[in-house]
Amino acid sequence: MAVQKSRKSRSRRDMRRSHHRMEIAEISVDATTGEKHRRHHMTKDGFYRGRQLFKVSQDA
């Protein structure tokens, strides 16, 4: 197993972890329906980039 030669400081550890933060998902608004959705995902009613891809049933 690898063993470090010298202890890393808190500063070095935190600098390494600086890229590990959580990012907020980007939100877009559909041009056709005006509904908010995640980028590159379709809306809940089946629209993506102005076209309806799926017919969503109202049973659920």
Swiss-Prot record:
Keywords: Ribonucleoprotein, Ribosomal protein
Biological processes per GO annotation: translation
Pfam families in the record: Ribosomal_L32p
Ranges of Basic residues composition bias in the record: 1-20
Segments for region (Disordered): 1-22
GO cellular component terms attached to this protein's record: large ribosomal subunit
Top-rank lineage group of the source organism: Bacteria
Keyword Lipoprotein part of the UniProt annotation: no
GO MF, one annotated term: structural constituent of ribosome
Family of the protein in this entry: Belongs to the bacterial ribosomal protein bL32 family.
Cited PANTHER family: 50S RIBOSOMAL PROTEIN L32, LARGE RIBOSOMAL SUBUNIT PROTEIN BL32
NCBIfam families given in the database record: rpmF_bact
Protein name: Large ribosomal subunit protein bL32
Gene: rpmF
